[in-house]
Amino acid sequence: TSSCFRQAAEEYGYKAQNFIIYPIKVNQMRPVVEEIISHGKKFNLGLEAGSKPELHAVIAINSDSDSLIICNGYKDESYIELALLAQKMGKRIFLVVEKMNELKLIAKMAKQLNVMPNIGIRIKLASSGSGKWEDSGGDASKFGLSSSELLEALDFLESKGLKDCLKLIHFHIGSQVTKIRRIKTALREASQFYVQLHAMGFKVEFVDIGGGLGVDYD
């Protein structure tokens, strides 16, 4: 996969860094994750946690302070606190907001712990994938912020002095996508969000692309 991406990057003149993120929910067995981390170092491999227990596992396994840790899933105060404490210890960790109340909790906990959090926002795109799981992405998804909610989040960040903390935008167009055209459409839409956010003074550094190509497992 990495060699294919490298070839495509050369063909289309893509110059930016790219990172591979492994969600440990796929397989949490320590020997498996350690092997993936070891092999993936040269490919900028990071890990994704979808819960507080998974984040505990990621912190314990991943000793590389340069690799990315992405925090998704439902976030209560204890999950957010663990992520922020890990950041204070030098971990390169990002909390991806899926609901407005999560953003307010992050701001509250960050103030208590005296840390400037690395914040990501999951955006609901109008575009969606295709196939069996298309409703898990796009504006039909129950996860992520709509355009109006995104504006509310941006106003909130600015009011709390956290404008510079928005480092990442995330979108998910669904699993088992059967039409490459849907992915292209979603990427164009996401790039517009990226450009507009920069124009508004939010210096987003990462675009986290979620979803997967259709694979015939039968």
PLM features: residue spans?
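Low-complexity, highly charged intrinsically disordered N-terminal segments
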Residues: 1-13, 23
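Active-site-proximal beta-alpha core segment in soluble small-molecule metabolic enzymes
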Residues: 19-206, 215
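Structured binding elements
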Residues: 209
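A short, charged/proline- and glycine-enriched loop
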Residues: 15-17
